[in-house]
Amino acid sequence: MRSEKHLLPLPPLLAICCLGTLHLSSGFPQSVPSYLEGLDIPESEIPSFVMDLCSSIYNRMKVNEENNHEIYKRFLFQFSRAKDPSLKIGESQIATAEYTKRDSSGIVGRPFFLFRPRNGRKVSINEH
């Protein structure tokens, strides 16, 4: 994946390849590659054939890019939403009330937690 940063983007690279296969009448002698000679296409129609081929490839790539963009947006939307908390506030209050320390005289009044309270908070004895 790191090598993609050094390569040209695909549409300009595709355009360069397509233009390289065409006959240019501006004085640059260019030969038609051997793979185009076996297609039984007259030389006058080869440039239009190559351009049609290039445009169909480019249009197919464009559709794939749009689909990838939609999938990426859906992925971001799905995972950027806040999740429902697994333990709701009401349930945690019930769980705290059920687990209280007891001694011989009854309930001391200071709840203990299965897990340590967040942010280093401590429960004072006078609160309950």
Curated annotation (Swiss-Prot):
UniProt cross-references to InterPro entries, sorted A to Z: Neuromedin-U_amidation-site, NmS
Q: Where in the cell is it found?
A: Secreted
Residue positions where Asparagine amide is found in the record:
119
Is Secreted found in the keyword set? yes
**What is the tissue localization of expression for this protein?**
Expressed by the skin glands.
Sorted alphabetically, the Gene Ontology cellular component annotations on this record are: extracellular region
Which keywords describe this protein according to UniProt? Amidation, Secreted, Signal
| Prodomain positions | 28-72, 75-100, 123-128
The secretion signal range is: 1-27
Q: What does this protein do?
A: Neuromedin-S-17: stimulates uterine smooth muscle contraction (B similarity). Synthetic peptide NmS-17 induces calcium mobilization in CHO cells transfected with either human FM-3/GPR66 (EC(50)=0.085 nM) or FM-4/TGR-1 (EC(50)=0.231 nM) NmU/NmS receptors.
**Family under the similarity heading:** Belongs to the NmU family.
The molecule here is called Neuromedin-S
Species this protein is from = Bombina variegata (Yellow-bellied toad)
Q: Gene encoding this chain?
A: nms
